[in-house]
Amino acid sequence: MRCNACWRDLEGRAISTTCGHLLCTEDASKILSNDGACPICDQVLSKSLMKPVDINPNEEWINMAMAGISPQILMKSAYRSVMFYIAQRDLEMQYKMNRVVAQCRQKCEGMQAKFSEKMEQVHTAYQKMGKRCQMMEQEVENLTKDKQELQEKFSEKSRQKRKLDEMYDQLRSEYESVKRTAIQPANNFYPRHQEPDFFSNPAVNMMENRETIRKDRSFFSPATPGPKDEIWPARQNSSNSGPFDISTDSPAIPSDLGNRRAGRGHPVYGGGGTANPQSTLRNLILSPIKRSQLSRSRPQLFTL
């Protein structure tokens, strides 16, 4: 058995009440001293409503208590005793259940407090994220506007660049046309002809192309008014037009060459002075060949 107030195991003597509850001596004295009520059914208790009982009676008390009592009374007493025991077990089970429920309620309250705190944190975080999403949406809108403005500026700059490229191409074409126009008169005024190469093989090219050069009159300057002499005068047998001067390793200059130069206003070789350097160079190159033909009668001075 257990005390219905403190639920401690009862040993020895206990106090039973008329309301069918069992108390320990300490709790019963507290109730009587304070004029309190039963802790189970809240019935006001007094000393007359309480009776001390022996929890573990001896054999002698059992034999003396049952003596002289009719079986009907014994059966009725046994029934009440059994019902009291069942009531005590029910109270004990209820106490245990209440205790478990209290523990579970305490745990649930703790968990509810934790979950409430978590929910508050989640709600706060949700509000922060909502504000941040609004800020991000505003920022995206601003960036979209900036992007549109930059696209418009880029399109304008691209259009200006294309226009500048077109202007540059036009100016370049005009510059090229002006350049070609400026170079064209010079090419027309000084016509160029394909001249023979005198220096690749002089001994062969000069002899082969001599007649061609003589026939090509485009190398000569315009004719000078007045009498003309031959470019290559005929050979004279006078003593003044002597042979080549071997001592000086150069051909002798004819004596009448100076008189002819002084008496005429145009050069000996038919050119116009320094006006036509190509004709002068050609005459200077061909003059030894002509003189060598005129002096074939001279013996060979050098032999290979």
UniProtKB/Swiss-Prot annotation:
> So what does this thing catalyse?
S-ubiquitinyl-[E2 ubiquitin-conjugating enzyme]-L-cysteine + [acceptor protein]-L-lysine = [E2 ubiquitin-conjugating enzyme]-L-cysteine + N(6)-ubiquitinyl-[acceptor protein]-L-lysine
Q: Which InterPro entries match?
A: HEI10-like, Znf_RING, Znf_RING/FYVE/PHD
Q: Name one GO molecular function term.
A: zinc ion binding
Q: Which UniProt keywords apply?
A: Chromosome, Coiled coil, DNA recombination, Meiosis, Metal-binding, Nucleus, Transferase, Ubl conjugation pathway, Zinc, Zinc-finger
Q: Which residues form a coiled coil?
A: 124-184
Protein transport as a keyword of this entry, yes or no, is no
Q: Knockout consequence?
A: Normal vegetative growth but fertility defects leading to reduced seed number per silique, due to abortion of male and female gametophytes characterized by abnormal tetrahedral structure becoming either asymmetric tetrads or polyads containing more than four products, because of impaired class I crossover (CO) formation during meiosis.
Describe, from its UniProt entry, the tissues in which this protein is expressed.
Expressed mostly in flower buds and roots.
- Known EC number(s)? 2.3.2.27
Where is the protein localized?
Answer: Nucleus; Chromosome
Specify where the region named Disordered lies, as residue ranges. 218-279
GO terms in the biological process aspect are:
chiasma assembly; homologous recombination; meiotic cell cycle; protein ubiquitination; reciprocal meiotic recombination
Query: In terms of one coarse class, where is the protein primarily found?
Result: nucleus
One Pfam family from the record: zf-RING_5
> Which GO CC annotations does the UniProt entry carry?
chiasma; chromosome
Q: Where is the composition biased (Polar residues)?
A: 235-250
Annotated zinc fingers (RING-type), start-end: 3-42
State the pathway, as annotated in the record.
Protein modification; protein ubiquitination
| Function recorded in the entry | Ubiquitin E3 ligase required for class I crossover (CO) formation during meiosis.
Q: What is this protein called?
A: E3 ubiquitin-protein ligase CCNB1IP1 homolog
Q: What is the lineage of its organism?
A: Eukaryota, Viridiplantae, Streptophyta, Embryophyta, Tracheophyta
